[in-house]
Amino acid sequence: MAESPSEEKYQVTLDNWRKYPYTYWSFVNVRNLIPTAGIETNLNSKTNFKKNITNLQDLKVIHQDIRYNFINVLKNCHTDAFLVMHKGVLIYEYFDKFTLKDSPHIIFSISKSLTSLLTGILFQEKKIDLNKTVSNIIPETKGTAYEDAKIRNVLDMNVASKFIEDYTGEAEIFKKYRSSTGWDLPDNNLKNNFDGLHDFLSNMPRSKLSHGQKYHYCSPNSDLLGWIIERVSQEKYYKLM
């Protein structure tokens, strides 16, 4: 990965970027793999933490009556970064491989929480009504599972859809979701792949359940929230964040 180009066995691609050992590099270089937008830091709100750095080199971790060196535990767990704070004071930092203090590291589903918080801010500002149906804001979702779902259903993850959150990667709808986001290459063995994430969300199949009847963890719901946020605010998601 340091050479240009790297040997084939070291090349990070859309086929392997979420697999070990390629994740060491890919998780801090996502912007070199898939389209992203940077979120600017507000320097006026930057917090400079007090520091009292402690050497944890001799700290031992006991597991099944065996004592392990703490640093070795971090390395054996393939930890990219580790930080300890106590009462607002930074007491320990650890970085490994390609991760540096200022490296933008992928946060995966933590972004769901951030998206929900942003939705809450817009609700507080009376820019979004949680009891409105999704299709009232996004007409493109008419005829889909989202058509008569309320925005509150989307937030609560109880939209009645046929989406399958399958991290084994075997479910057809999950494969199509991944490729629609640009995370994976399209599976040419599948018919009717989608032309981007908006196209995928505009074709979400409905289940036989009622909205609100059952909790259903569904990552596309958070993507849809991002779309709703952009539509009601007339701003790009990353700029609002």
Task: Give the positions of each predicted feature.
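Active-site SXXK
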Residues: 88, 106-130, 154, 225-229
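N-terminal core-entry segment
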Residues: 84-89, 95, 152-156, 167-171, ...
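Soluble non-cytosolic domains of exported or imported proteins
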Residues: 64, 79, 105, 109, ...
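Catalytic-site signature segments of enzymes, centered on catalytic residues
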Residues: 101-102, 167-169, 178-241
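Active-site helix/loop module of the DD-peptidase/beta-lactamase fold
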Residues: 106, 124-167, 206, 233-241
